């Protein structure tokens, strides 16, 4: 069984924001990644302990009256999450830290991300925004409410490519495969453009450019970094990049 998850929050930074809406919808799927049954929606709002900002109200559609005195059912939400073999969100790098901070009993589960782990272009889609993907698939929904986003996600997971494979099947394959987080520690300032062009992003906390690559791409990435970023004359302040293996249990954190 899998669960589709979405959160609405008071901010983009997990250390400064709080969940104000959590939605979970369980679903069953077969060995081919075809969804065979969709369960009921579970949705909670939660009072963050302070008034919502106008920006939060505009983005989420939630008001102070919607969340006043409300709490997430921690026991039920944790039970649902732990009952699943995979937790799917459309932007797991955002949703997972919020969920695990709020529901500590749901830490260490296998997560997948339909935003970053699906090759949407090869499936004939432009862009990766949830609403835009759904429109291209022929559906319309009200964005920025957790329950609506979860339902939209489930519909996308059911979508089939020309060869019959579902989005969920592709996602599960990517989720189960180990990958590497690559940190270009000590890269010179002048290397930022080539790193960015290769898909690296800046992590202000680690103060390093990083990317995630498939397990079988490590050798090629090591060679590229050695010749482009860490070669003599490139100005790197470290001898080599850092590679950390990640799996579905610790990815997106």
For the regions a protein language model found, what residue spans apply to each?
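Conserved non-catalytic scaffold segment of RNase H-like nuclease domains
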Residues: 1-109, 123-143, 234-237, 244
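Residue-level "edge-of-site" marker
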Residues: 70, 147, 208
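HAD-like small-molecule phosphatases
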Residues: 78-79, 85, 96-100, 117-120, ...
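Short, acidic/small-residue loops that bind anionic groups at enzyme active sites
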Residues: 108-118
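Acidic, divalent-metal-coordinating active-site segment for phosphoryl/phosphodiester hydrolysis
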Residues: 148-156
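Acidic two-metal-ion nuclease catalytic site recognized across multiple nuclease folds
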Residues: 159-253
């Amino acid at each position: 069984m899998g669960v589709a998850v979405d959160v609405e929050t008071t901010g983009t930074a997990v250390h400064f924001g709080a969940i104000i809406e959590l939605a979970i919808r369980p679903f069953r799927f077969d060995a081919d990644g075809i969804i065979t049954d969709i369960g009921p929606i579970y949705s909670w709002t939660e009072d963050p302990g302070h008034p919502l900002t106008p920006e939060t109200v505009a983005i989420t559609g939630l008001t102070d009256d919607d969340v006043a005195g409300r709490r997430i059912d921690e026991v039920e939400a944790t039970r649902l999450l732990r009952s699943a073999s995979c937790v799917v969100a459309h932007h797991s790098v955002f949703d997972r830290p919020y969920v695990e901070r709020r529901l500590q009993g749901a830490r260490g589960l296998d997560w997948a991300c339909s935003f970053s782990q699906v090759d949407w272009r090869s499936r004939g889609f432009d862009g990766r925004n949830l609403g835009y993907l759904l429109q291209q698939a022929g559906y319309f929904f009200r964005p920025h409410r957790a329950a609506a986003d979860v339902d939209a996600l489930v519909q996308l997971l059911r979508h089939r490519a020309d060869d019959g494979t579902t989005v969920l099947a592709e996602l599960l394959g990517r989720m189960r495969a180990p990958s590497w987080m690559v940190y270009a520690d000590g890269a010179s300032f002048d290397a930022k453009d080539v790193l960015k062009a290769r898909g690296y992003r800046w992590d202000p906390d680690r103060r390093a450019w990083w990317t995630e690559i498939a397990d079988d791409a490590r050798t090629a990435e090591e060679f590229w970094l050695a010749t482009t970023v860490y070669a003599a004359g490139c100005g790197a302040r470290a001898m080599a990049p850092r590679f950390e293996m990640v799996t579905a249990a610790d990815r997106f954190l």
